[in-house]
Amino acid sequence: MAKKIKQIAIYGKGGIGKSTTTSNISAALSVAGYKVMQFGCDPKSDSTNTLRGGEYIPTVLDTLRDKQIVRAHDVIFEGFNGIYCVEAGGPAPGVGCAGRGIITSVSLLKQQKVFEELDLDYVIYDVLGDVVCGGFAVPVREGIAEHVFTVTSADFMALYAANNLFKGIHKYSTEGGALLGGVIANSINAPYAKEIVDDFVARTHTQVMEYVPRSVSVTQAELQGKTTIEADPNSKQAQIYKSLAQKIVDHTESKVPVPLETSELREWASNWGKQLVELEAGVLSPAAAGNL
């Protein structure tokens, strides 16, 4: 009987730290002994950079444009600790759908049965989550990923993107689509930021997988073209990423989230905005102040 490969998708608004988080999860899983492939699904094609010393790799779409026949191994490159790296890529500027690269790339690797050949334990799709359009929704819509996680901060636009993803998951949940594993709360340093994310998670009926603080160790590692797991494996930040990776290993049951309507989300955000104004003015709201 063939080994079951655990396939997960990690979504997040551009600039939220999605690729940083994904690469550190991949690195942590690899260090723990799992065979991992990281599949970059962003037209910027930089998902796997910190797994390969800061180097870009040829994308699937670029390779298909250059060659008539493409073998899957033409687009798979080895990174830190044997992690397999793939970048879907995007169309030429101004032409076509950016999400098309995901559809084409997944089809290429599946047709050639690469996941089974490499005896993978995990395939992690790093997906742009600003817009869950046709191409970018593939891991959710087609049920390619078994579990979906989203990276967000306490910033409104990051939560807005997460809520949009929840709408997509909810829409496809009755058609065999992937379900939500939980939220990865990133750049959580202030007590009020944790309170905001916790409140959002409670209202959308999901869970926080891990709180990841902003850390200079991440910046230092990325300037070297490395993950924190590789550059500073004994740091507190590396331990947080390892904890997150273990929680993903242990995770078995994903659920359908309950997204907020746009008007509800706007009203909720406005109420939090008022609490933060009170906090800044010295009128300490227990929720906004983290019960300090």
From Swiss-Prot:
Signal peptide residues on this chain, from the entry's feature table: none
Entry note: cofactor: Binds 1 [4Fe-4S] cluster per dimer.
UniProt keyword annotations, A-Z: 4Fe-4S, ADP-ribosylation, ATP-binding, Iron, Iron-sulfur, Metal-binding, Nitrogen fixation, Nucleotide-binding, Oxidoreductase
Catalyzed reactions: N2 + 8 reduced [2Fe-2S]-[ferredoxin] + 16 ATP + 16 H2O = H2 + 8 oxidized [2Fe-2S]-[ferredoxin] + 2 NH4(+) + 16 ADP + 16 phosphate + 6 H(+)
Enzyme class: oxidoreductase
Annotated EC: 1.18.6.1
Transmembrane regions listed in the UniProt entry: none
Reported cofactor(s): [4Fe-4S] cluster
Chain residues that bind [4Fe-4S] cluster: C97, C133
Residues modified to ADP-ribosylarginine: R100
Molecular function GO terms recorded: 4 iron, 4 sulfur cluster binding; ATP binding; metal ion binding; nitrogenase activity
Key word Iron-sulfur present: yes
GO biological process: nitrogen fixation
PTM description: The reversible ADP-ribosylation of Arg-100 inactivates the nitrogenase reductase and regulates nitrogenase activity.
PROSITE patterns: NIFH_FRXC_1, NIFH_FRXC_2, NIFH_FRXC_3
Residues where ATP binds: G12, K13, G14, G15, I16, G17, K18, S19
Pfam families in the cross-refs: Fer4_NifH
Function: The key enzymatic reactions in nitrogen fixation are catalyzed by the nitrogenase complex, which has 2 components: the iron protein and the molybdenum-iron protein.
Subunit structure: Homodimer.
Family classification: Belongs to the NifH/BchL/ChlL family.
Entries under PANTHER family matching the protein: LIGHT-INDEPENDENT PROTOCHLOROPHYLLIDE REDUCTASE IRON-SULFUR ATP-BINDING PROTEIN
Protein name: Nitrogenase iron protein 2
Gene: nifH2
